[in-house]
Structures are given as C-alpha cells and as structure tokens.
Amino acid sequence: MKISLIQFPIVPGDRLANFDQVRRRVQQAARAGSDMAVLPELWDLSFYPPDVYDLADEEGRQAQAFLQDLAASCHIQLIGGSIVRRHDGCLYNTTYIVDEEGNRVSSYDKCHLFTPGGEEKVFAPGDHLNTFFLGDIPMASITCYDLRFGEWVRMAALAGAQILFVPAAWPHPRLTHWQILNRDRAIENQFFVVAVNSCGTCGDYRFCGHSMIIDPWGEVLAQGGDGEEIVTGEIDLSVIKDIRSRINVFRDRRPELYHLEGKR
C-alpha cells in the first residue's frame, strides 16, 4: 500500500484557499500512484482563527462534500485530517474517512482536548474510539494530543487495527515528543503508525512537520522535514503477523492486573 502524507502550511481562516491546496496535493499524490492520502489536523481553518465559531463548517457539510468528490475523482482513499465542525451549537475537531469511490466510511471527534492550549474552551470532546475498514484492512484514527494517551491507542490495537492514523498540528518545541511518541505507539502495539503534521505558523505557533510512516518495529519508513512537502512511503501489512509471532505482547498481557483509573 502506497501512502502519501500531505504536509503543508494551512492558511488561517481561509477554507477555500485550503481546499485548493489540498486538491492540488492530493491530485499530485494520485498521479504518483498513491493508494491513500492523509491530511493534517484542522486543515480547513488552522488552529484556530478568532472567529472560528462563525467560520465553522455546519455539520461538516462542506468538508464532506469536498473530500468525497476529491476521493472519487482521484480514485484515492482519504484520511481527511480534521476540520472544525459545528453541531448543535458546539464545535468539534472532526475527522472524516472516505474510500476511493467517494463514500464516507467513518468519522471521529477528537476525544482528548489539549487543555494547556485552551482547546476545551473552543471544542467539545468526542466520546468514542474510531475504528474502521478500508477494503479488508482494519484501521483506526486519533488526533494529535490523543497520541499521549497510551491506553486510548491500546484500545485501537485491541479492536484489531493494523494501521493507526495520527493527523496533528504539533508545535516545534515538542518535536522530540512527536517523534518518540509515534514510534513508541507503533512498537508497543505492533502496528503501523501513519502520522501527518502541518508546517508553517499560526499566530505564535510554529508547527514542526516531520510527518512519518513507522513500521511495527518502530523503524521510520518515511519522514518529512519541517517544510511543505508530500511524504510518501509503502507499507507491507504482512510484517505484522511476523513481528507478533516473535514477540507476542497481546498473548502475554495481564489485563487482570491493570487498574487505570488512578488519581487525577
């Protein structure tokens, strides 16, 4: 499977400009033979303009129509990063998954909101894990800060996911965290991690890029720099069975010993 990660500087507050950027890059990936393209977090408006509520996509209709048309016209699967969706008066950080025929397969609202950045003042949190199939391949997606919660990612692995997608808007000062956490989640869950970040700036934020494809051994198969680019790599899902046969952490788990509520 050939996957392209669309790493680009998002234009704050300008949905149409960002639609145009995404369209051109996805078309380029499709022409290069990619089976799938993956977008970063909040690629429609960035993170986030002062008038975000008024600019938000009501029920995600604009983004869904755009992604479905783009996927069908390019015959490419899309992990639609995330967009600002308005629903019942609240805003959600929402991901849409679309197959190569333009059918919406799944959606996800970011569940862990980044309180140091005040996300909880802007967005309402989601309340469910996102696992889905594209073709016959079980997959899952999370969003940015969700990556720091290992138990959340482990739930995706236990649900059978073979690929975890991580759209993000990860800032440059924590680049090392980004690289380590993505590799760690791949190793401990013995699946592929496909993590796409934005680049450029938004206000005081500078995003670190370095979109990555990581195999279940934690080896980086493809990685971008800190600027605009399409990062492309190929994955071979057959290695998952081989790795799990050699070190079977799922067989050796002791869930009866794990008590995760703890103290806040």
Language model: regions and residue ranges:
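Active-site-proximal beta-strand elements of phosphoester/diester hydrolases
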Residues: M1-P12, V38, T94, S107, ...
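CN hydrolase (nitrilase-like) catalytic-core segments centered on the catalytic cysteine
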Residues: G60-I79, R148-E234
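Hydrophobic residues at beta-strand termini and immediately following loops
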Residues: I6, L55, Y108, F132, ...
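Long hydrophobic alpha-helical segments typical of transmembrane helices together
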Residues: M212-G262
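Short beta->alpha transition motifs characteristic of CBS
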Residues: L45, V52, Y96, Y108-F114, ...
